[in-house]
Amino acid sequence: MKFVLLFGVLLVTLFSYSSAEMLDDFDQADEDELLSLIEKEEARRDCIPKHHECTSNKHGCCRGHLFKYKCQCTTVVTQSGEETERCFCGTPPHHKAAELVVGFGKKIFG
């Protein structure tokens, strides 16, 4: 009888220890997910909105509804005759077409 009682106490102790380890692992996973979400949110805040200048940071455009905006550049001639490159974040034509098709599909199929 003493052996069964001792074995039961040992089993309960091991079970509580293992469940505490699992909970610690779950808590660590939750913290890691939270940190990655915070990093994504910070990156989202730092991005360049649509129609804003992206000349100095060509890969920093924000995401649109379906696609990330692309930095589109043009050459501008100033009044002094000097050519400079000006860039802005925008939606490329093929992305606009895809968004239009998806929009029609959502309207038709609900």
Curated annotation (Swiss-Prot):
<dbReference type="InterPro" id="IPR011142">
    <property type="entry name" value="Spider_toxin_CSTX_Knottin_CS"/>
</dbReference>
<feature type="propeptide">
    <location>
        <begin position="21"/>
        <end position="44"/>
    </location>
</feature>
<feature type="disulfide bond">
    <location>
        <begin position="54"/>
        <end position="71"/>
    </location>
</feature>
<keyword id="KW-0960">Knottin</keyword>
<protein>
    <recommendedName>
        <fullName>U1-lycotoxin-Ls1ee</fullName>
    </recommendedName>
</protein>
<dbReference type="GO" id="GO:0005576">
    <property type="term" value="C:extracellular region"/>
</dbReference>
<keyword id="KW-0964">Secreted</keyword>
<feature type="signal peptide">
    <location>
        <begin position="1"/>
        <end position="20"/>
    </location>
</feature>
<dbReference type="GO" id="GO:0090729">
    <property type="term" value="F:toxin activity"/>
</dbReference>
<feature type="disulfide bond">
    <location>
        <begin position="73"/>
        <end position="87"/>
    </location>
</feature>
<keyword id="KW-0732">Signal</keyword>
<feature type="disulfide bond">
    <location>
        <begin position="47"/>
        <end position="62"/>
    </location>
</feature>
<keyword id="KW-1015">Disulfide bond</keyword>
<comment type="similarity">
    <text>Belongs to the neurotoxin 19 (CSTX) family. 03 subfamily.</text>
</comment>
<dbReference type="Pfam" id="PF10530">
    <property type="entry name" value="Toxin_35"/>
</dbReference>
<dbReference type="InterPro" id="IPR019553">
    <property type="entry name" value="Spider_toxin_CSTX_knottin"/>
</dbReference>
<feature type="disulfide bond">
    <location>
        <begin position="61"/>
        <end position="89"/>
    </location>
</feature>
<keyword id="KW-0800">Toxin</keyword>
